[in-house]
């Protein structure tokens, strides 16, 4: 595998120097299983303003790399930026949710703003059940869910450091100081 990738890299360097742009693009598209070439193909599509190709390349990358969390999130972030550029709010909400479930808490406020009001509380509760701990904590703080904060502190008293300022002004203040 390593030798094959090295050979492909050498071939690409020769094409960059002596080949036509079309030959370079064809080479890149034949080697999309290599993340470096997928990144190049995505960048070429962005430069050409071809957002449907960006989306397709990112989705294919997610499918191929679903067992590799780092690459999976990289391709999800490509879709995130693609949907920002195209203004596709539903798809943007979906990819934000996928990033949240993958442990990226920074997408919470944007995701929440994209959810229709009548579905918001149900979707938040659903996400709380599936969220990794970093995202779970972010949601509790953002939504001021002192009931769940108190519950979390009872299970793991070290969480008190994170939640104490919210709990000290709540009905759970006495329980928080006892912990």
Language-model segment annotations:
Residues 1-179:
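Eukaryote-biased, non-catalytic alpha-solenoid scaffold regions
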């Amino acid at each position: 595998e390593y030798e094959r990738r090295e050979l492909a890299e050498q071939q690409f360097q020769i094409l960059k120097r002596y080949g036509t742009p079309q030959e370079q693009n064809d080479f890149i598209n034949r080697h999309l299983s290599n993340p470096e070439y997928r990144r190049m193909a995505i960048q070429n599509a962005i430069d050409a303003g071809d957002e449907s190709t960006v989306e397709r390349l990112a989705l294919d990358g997610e499918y191929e790399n679903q067992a590799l969390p780092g690459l999976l999130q990289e391709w999800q972030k490509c879709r995130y930026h693609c949907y920002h550029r195209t203004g596709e709010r539903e798809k943007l909400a979906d990819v934000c949710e996928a990033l949240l479930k993958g442990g990226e808490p920074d997408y919470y406020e944007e995701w929440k703003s994209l959810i229709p009001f009548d579905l918001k509380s149900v979707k938040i509760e659903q996400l709380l059940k599936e969220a990794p701990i970093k995202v779970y904590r972010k949601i509790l703080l953002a939504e001021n869910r002192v009931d769940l904060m108190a519950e979390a502190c009872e299970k793991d008293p070290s969480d008190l450091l994170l939640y104490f300022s919210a709990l000290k002004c709540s009905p759970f203040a006495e329980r928080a100081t006892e912990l």
